[in-house]
């Protein structure tokens, strides 16, 4: 496994891979890797000749400076995990390599609508940062496929739209959420949880399950369903941030013709902002 930190060396290897006709898969990450990331790697390995994992804590997508400072950086441990998984390349650039002139005045990529709705409304600039760094990685690495987790449901939808709108010839693969045995979605931010909070954390998944049961049963009183869910989370020790029930295909409000719904949930537990989602097939 080769660790690459500079753009010239990355470009040199990408040119060689292209000359050899290799099928390249990209797994973009911010590091602090867990089993969910390893599932992305496994999916990439199954679909390509060469797997490149990027590890870059992208300052452009953090809406809170303290969150950027606190974000876990575990490059050595991450590389050890990826080496055991027989990943071919790790691209781990410094911030100065990606943004040599700083963020002020940096050209960015913005996906209208999806960037500012739902999660984007509560985290201004976040999705603009995501689409910009992903676009830069696509331009640098020129992958045939790229793997993203379905845990970040809106992010995946945004990237799919960006790829379509910008005419990238890249297959976007969504990989299902990996959960702990108690249902908690794996996330790098779970590291912020205390031992006591970790016991409470699966409550977010349990609340989503109860919402799903109501939707499957035909209940469409969405405001009431959401209010009950938020109250339940707050009683469990969470601070409910945002719960939405949307059309899974458009992320717009549900209509009578919607075939699938997605429950999008975000809640604070101590210093950790947990997000999760669940899709539901609706009775027609």
Swiss-Prot record:
GO terms for molecular function: ATP binding; pantoate-beta-alanine ligase activity. InterPro entries: Cyt_trans-like (IPR004821), Pantoate_ligase (IPR003721), Pantoate_ligase_C (IPR042176), Rossmann-like_a/b/a_fold (IPR014729). Its EC number is 6.3.2.1. GO terms for biological process: pantothenate biosynthetic process. It is found in: Cytoplasm. Disulfide bonds: none annotated. One of its GO terms (cellular component) is cytosol. The active site is at residue 37. (R)-pantoate binds at residues 61, 155. Catalyzes the condensation of pantoate with beta-alanine in an ATP-dependent reaction via a pantoyl-adenylate intermediate. This is Pantothenate synthetase.
